[in-house]
Amino acid sequence: HSSITNVRLAGLAVSTGSQTRDFMADGLALGHDRVMLERTAQTIGLRQRKVAAPGITALDLCEDAARRLLDAAGLDPSSIDAVIFVTQTPDHSQPNNASLLHGRLGLATGAAAFDLSLGCSGWVYGLQQAALLCAHGGAARVLLCAGDTLSRLTNPGDRSTDPLFGDAGSATLIEKTGRSTPLHFVLGADGSGAEASA
């Protein structure tokens, strides 16, 4: 358990893929049974998802979200002290997405940039890291981006995973503040069952 004070979430912007995939239409086109598709749709609660157009990456989606966030907040990119990029679908192995976004946005050369390779828990881990940078690392503003294009990794014939994953990017602004209301974190992991998901 940890609590971090003097930090606030100052803004959030999201950018989704521009195309819409329909779970039922995709499943019927692959020859799946309509009754089974209806049952699956009822279970997962989704019938549509947003996916990125060909050539659009997680970096592109997060850049769009970050630009809109900075514009809405009236902030110059040079006021950002660090960028954290959470993704499991980076554009390249090197350089990392955070460094590429740093360059695209024109952040100051003194601004830190690093990726976190995490899935569902990634934004929360990124938020903790951003809050720590603001509270104890000398940063006044941190840009936390989380984005993936997981639709490109799933098998369209797999009804258990394909309908769950779309493509999106988000940008969250975390700022140092005099406010004492703490952010509370309880982080943990259990890697003992990793082979069960393979």
At which residue positions do the language-model features occur?
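Phosphate/pyrophosphate-binding loops at sites that engage ATP/ADP/AMP, CoA/4′-phosphopantetheine
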Residues: 65-81
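Short loop/turn motifs at secondary-structure junctions
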Residues: 74-79, 138, 178-181
